Amino acid sequence: MSLEAFHHSEPLTLGVELELQLVSTNDYDLAPYAEDMLRIMKKVPLPGSVVPEMTNSMIEISTGVCHSSSEVLGQLTQIRDALVKSADKLNIAVVGGGTHPFQQWHERRIYDKPRFQELSQLYGYLSKQFTIFGQHVHIGCPDADSALLMLHRMSRYIPHFIALSASSPYVQAQDTQFDSARLNSVFAFPLSGRAPCVLTWSEFEQYFNKMTRTGVVKSMKDFYWDIRPKPEYGTIEIRVFDTPLTIERAAALAGYVQSLAAWFLAEQPFTPTEDDYLVYTYNRFQACRFGLDAVYVDPASGDHMPLRDHILQTLDHVARYAGTHGASGALHMLRGETALGQNDARWLRERQREEQLLAEVSRQAALRFRGHDI
């Protein structure tokens, strides 16, 4: 199968996908209600889409094409409000977060869709363990070569995205000591990690063709990279975010991506090289493990610094581009919470310290997703 041509898209436009938990309001464990939710949601006119995911206790929502983080928030608000109403009819709740804090993976059931069934046959128990919940952000690129440059420039900021979105400290009722344990499940897949460092579409086509000849890859969907090109949309797709507990944070993260992308296109600040990836896995681990308290190694200079400081410096650097694209409020929110070391993983741990019951933490997270200020 040949690689699809890179389609035209408006540069710097956004699209956001969120994978969400469906939980019972009796015990706040995951509940297999995806099919019922989708049946109800089909009747509601909404922007974007609501679709099934790998197991039947999760769904994915997505926006349409948006021009700003405020437009993302507007669309997510419409979809969220409709989800909440539908869930209330079924006596279930919808929750954000990168992992459910105490579900048992072996109890999950694969959603009845051919691709999910094929993946289950291929990956065995990993498929059920893939009941994890991420946010994906698409950013429009001017052309195919620009998309690859954008992808590899964004790779330097993967630790930012992980730490700012981290919301998966608990797995099977245990505190993993990771802020983002979700990504540990992704690492198990053979085609995860990072894209090859090629900077032209013709080189990327050659790589793709080699991979398809091996029989390992049939389409771009087979790559579980942290960032991958989406030629059918004319975008790159950043896939390392945990699903935040609120749609406000999800929209703010999209605003940060857009501000970075605007800086890259306007200033072409550096040319990515293979050496950028010497510290990639280390930086990624640090962000997953320690969140905003991680260490960041600058790939260009080799300097070590607190990740929090690097995020704050970058937020300042892209502030004028945020202003141009209506993302100043989004970056202001991220700046304030970064300065305090506050991400969703910390919020979840604080609730657990207070409540000593993960079901109650999940209940409060459901209220937070609804828009309650707790």
UniProtKB/Swiss-Prot annotation:
Gene3D superfamilies, per the entry: 3.30.590.20
EC number(s) given by UniProt: 6.3.2.2
GO MF, one annotated term: glutamate-cysteine ligase activity
Coiled coil feature spans: none
Catalytic activity: L-cysteine + L-glutamate + ATP = gamma-L-glutamyl-L-cysteine + ADP + phosphate + H(+)
Keyword ATP-binding tagged: yes
The keyword Nucleus belongs to this UniProt entry's keyword annotation: no
SUPFAM superfamilies: Glutamine synthetase/guanido kinase
Keywords: ATP-binding, Ligase, Nucleotide-binding
Swiss-Prot/TrEMBL GO biological process terms: modified amino acid biosynthetic process
InterPro entries: GCL_type2/YbdK_subfam, GCS2, Gln_synth/guanido_kin_cat_dom, YbdK
Family stated for the protein in its record: Belongs to the glutamate--cysteine ligase type 2 family. YbdK subfamily.
HAMAP family: Glu_cys_ligase_2 (MF_01609)
Function field: ATP-dependent carboxylate-amine ligase which exhibits weak glutamate--cysteine ligase activity.
Protein name: Putative glutamate--cysteine ligase 2
Lineage of the species this protein comes from: Bacteria, Pseudomonadati, Pseudomonadota, Betaproteobacteria, Burkholderiales
